[in-house]
Amino acid sequence: MSANSFDARSTLQVGDESYEIFRLDKVEGSARLPYSLKVLLENLLRTEDGANITADHIRALGGWDSQAQPSQEIQFTPARVIMQDFTGVPCVVDLATMREAVKELGGDPAKINPLAPAELVIDHSVIADKFGTNDAFKQNVELEYGRNKERYQFLRWGQTAFDEFKVVPPGTGIVHQVNIEHLARTVMVRGGQAYPDTLVGTDSHTTMVNGLGVLGWGVGGIEAEAAMLGQPVSMLIPRVVGFKLTGELKPGTTATDLVLTITEMLRGHGVVGKFVEFYGEGVAATSLANRATIGNMSPEFGSTAAIFPIDDETLNYLRLTGRSEQQVALVESYAKEQGLWLDPAAEPDFSEKLELDLSTVVPSIAGPKRPQDRIVLAEAAQQFAKDVLNYVEAPAAQPAASASPVDEASAESFPASDAPAYGSQENGAGAPQHADGTGAAVPSNPVTVTAPDGTSYEIDHGAVTVAAITSCTNTSNPYVMVAAALVAKKAVEKGLTRKPWVKTTLAPGSKVVTDYFEKSGLTPYLDKVGFNLVGYGCTTCIGNSGPLPEEVSKAVNDHDLAVTSVLSGNRNFEGRINPDVKMNYLASPPLVVAYALAGSMKVDITKDALGTDQDGNPVYLKDIWPSEAEVNDVVANAIGEDMFSKSYSDVFAGDAQWQALPIPTGNTFEWDPESTYVRKPPYFEGMEMEPAPVEDIAGARVLAKLGDSVTTDHISPAGAIKADTPAGKYLTEHGVERRDFNSYGSRRGNHEVMIRGTFANIRLRNQIAPGTEGGYTRDFTKDDAPVSFIYDASRNYIEQGIPLVVLAGKEYGSGSSRDWAAKGTALLGVKAVIAESYERIHRSNLIGMGVLPLQFPEGQSAATLGLTGEETFSFSGVTELNNGTTPRTVKVTTDTGVEFDAVVRIDTPGEADYYRNGGIMQYVLRSLIRK
């Protein structure tokens, strides 16, 4: 119930329905705010409680100074939570564990349910193993179920056990496309109230829904769990960059060309930690599908969100996708009543401004390794000839460009798609990077390959070995998808097909795509050029491209060929799309088809022939490129509201395989002691209703002493599990074959694997174990403190009751927002971290897991204080938290005589409550039982 200090509670009549709303015009200054901040303002008005959210917070947002640096913290309560399976499974594991804890404390386990609607779409597990055949989809689904049966059984139980929790089963679509086509409300209705639809998601590209006027972004699992359980998300009131659009796109240019141009502009400007908001006359000329493509790539821009206001185009899309007339009428009435309707002539207050004339956008691709490295299509072959030198001619001699934190966060998000998290000093500005390679000859090393059917062909540097129509970024956009299918049709009619070394895949983000291909008669043409359906899921975009054909892979590796991929995704970092492929290019779906026909990045597809027709005449791209009228004609005739309504009528039901999964019944989950994917974590063991008093920390040893810019991927890697590591040994001991290890990302529901993977990144350098790389430390419980695995040493410390501490440099915990970086740290027995500075989300996650984040005094560090990591540490003054106050500093002393006052980085009253309770889950659990 809102405190309603501003007398903002009112009613809105729409047809026969009446809704309670909170009027923005009751707050002075609200009219000049950007759309995105108006949405936040309504959120504060509606959730004002006088404690976490006060009238002062509301006034601060109403009186927002567009030129000030962000400093005011506010508590944002998202309307709902969206998840995918990699990042969502651990959230559901925690909910299931909370139910058991409630039962053990004498409460009703059925009380533990998401308080905000939570929806999980299974899309991250399908791998494009099989391709180029009519049964590729069926085979890939069977392989997916084989690999993921334990996880799927668990999610199937969750689907039946929890209220307000829904699961979209595998083989249905990609989370963000399902979100815009079906789940998003634009205006929410709950308990008789109408308010803007907002969300947080456990995936970096959650921002796709910004195209629909819905404010939301990616967060880590701990924040998502908190939001599900009704806790607000802490954030700073951001700067807002106004991005003015004028004019309209020229025929022949696509949404992909537009978004790559915007990526280049925004990365050049620097928008980390900021909202980007589109305005101006050109917004009306930007289709909703194009807006969604732009919103999707907000993480690649570096921004928190990239949002479009509500207008007629929004309403048309809601109608097209089968939303009810009452819902569409509500969205229109609410937006107009609250000043959220787009006025193309208005210029709200913005912190910074950029402008793009849409008519200047030209056909483009981006690569070979970063999404902001845009290349004009007409110059792509020339630029490839220069860039390939970095991969062929003595790569060691090439000076490595230092990765920006935006690139690092994005690159590390494979395959789990964790949300990015950046340090406070970073704005993400940076120019595109390309080799100049002037005057150098294009390297060539042709290799003959023999296919299983006995035919042979030559491949060389630059061969396109993967051509993937993939990713919700583009498969949600009917215009580029139909254009791709028409390129395929015209190519087939001219007698062209893909080159034999190209692995071609089609993996749309929803079944609507294949429905309109079928209805328009275009499916057979896509099949004929090799773009058979391989799955409905992320596939190649997150690196699940599956292996190249054996003979191609062998030739590439034996001869060290710099081969390429072309994909319609959103990220293209080196080695992430396929381990055999060094250079990756982002392109629109029709260009993906064109490059599959050309077979090499050396081909200038704007001038060179892609092949020859039946009569031996050269066929050029212009001969098979569809006109805008042809594309629009198919879209108009093949896509209608009935298609979306039918496709989503039973979206949560799943296929026969899903429905046949054996699932336990009841309010609590029956944990399988043999499972290596899903296990009950120990967060609540021994927990009582009253939290034990906070204690000072004495006799602590250093587990790791780390440098600057240690990312969450260093702390908790998401990628492959090596056999000779504690996690690999654990899986081997539990009967898992090495080929079935899967990734850390897929095993986040098993704390035993994840603890062993904490600080286990092969690139980690622990300064107390010099000369080592990876998860090593020195074990001071043993004579001479030998080098040991971090996990093994932590068990010895825990056995002897010795608390642990981590020492770190600047920007500790940057990269992606990965909850296991904090969970793993806590489960290793770490009680405190002392760093020079923190990334904001990781700092709050540490508190959420009961770990104390401390900061060295200004200008001091482990080095200036002479700390080696061999000391024993004690911390006094922490107990002040028992008196209801948070100490500004605590006294740190070592057995070597070093003393200093460390700054306590518990920054809000809510965080202090979490820490006193031993963590956020314990706090929420006690609160729910008391209710």
Curated annotation (Swiss-Prot):
Induction of the gene: The transcription rate is high during the early growth phase, which is characterized by non-production of the phosphinothricin tripeptide (PTT). After 24 hours, when PTT production starts, the transcription decreases. Several putative, regulatory protein binding sites are detected in the promoter region of acnA, which suggests complex regulation of this gene.
Keywords, sorted A to Z: 4Fe-4S, Iron, Iron-sulfur, Lyase, Metal-binding, RNA-binding, Tricarboxylic acid cycle
Cofactor(s) the record lists: [4Fe-4S] cluster
Pathway field: Carbohydrate metabolism; tricarboxylic acid cycle; isocitrate from oxaloacetate: step 2/2
PANTHER family: ACONITASE/IRON-RESPONSIVE ELEMENT FAMILY MEMBER
NCBIfam families: PRK09277.1 (NF006757), PRK12881.1 (NF009520)
UniProt function note: Catalyzes the reversible isomerization of citrate to isocitrate via cis-aconitate in the tricarboxylic acid (TCA) cycle. Aconitase activity is important for the initiation of morphological and physiological differentiation of S.viridochromogenes. In addition, the apo form of AcnA (lacking the [4Fe-4S] cluster) functions as a RNA-binding regulatory protein, which binds to iron responsive elements (IREs) located on the untranslated region of certain mRNAs, including recA and ftsZ. Binding to IRE-like structures probably alters the target mRNA stability and regulates the protein amount.
Disrupted gene: phenotype observed: Mutant is unable to develop aerial mycelium and to sporulate, resulting in a bald phenotype. Furthermore, the mutant does not produce the antibiotic phosphinothricin tripeptide (PTT), suggesting a defect in physiological differentiation. It is also sensitive to oxidative and temperature stress. Mutant cannot be complemented by pmi.
UniProt binding sites for [4Fe-4S] cluster: 472, 538, 541
Note: AcnA cannot substitute for the function of the phosphinomethylmalate isomerase Pmi, despite the high similarity of the two proteins.
Ranges for region Disordered: 402-454
GO terms for MF: 2-methylisocitrate dehydratase activity; 4 iron, 4 sulfur cluster binding; aconitate hydratase activity; metal ion binding; RNA binding
Reactions that this protein is recorded to catalyse: citrate = D-threo-isocitrate; citrate = cis-aconitate + H2O; cis-aconitate + H2O = D-threo-isocitrate
Pfam families on file: Aconitase, Aconitase_C
Gene (name only): acnA
Protein family membership: Belongs to the aconitase/IPM isomerase family.
Protein name: Aconitate hydratase A
CDD domains referenced in this protein's UniProt entry, alphabetically: AcnA_IRP_Swivel
Record Gene3D superfamilies: 6.10.190.10, Aconitase, domain 3, Aconitase, domain 4
Organism expressing this protein natively: Streptomyces viridochromogenes (strain DSM 40736 / JCM 4977 / BCRC 1201 / Tue 494)
Enzyme superclass (EC): lyase
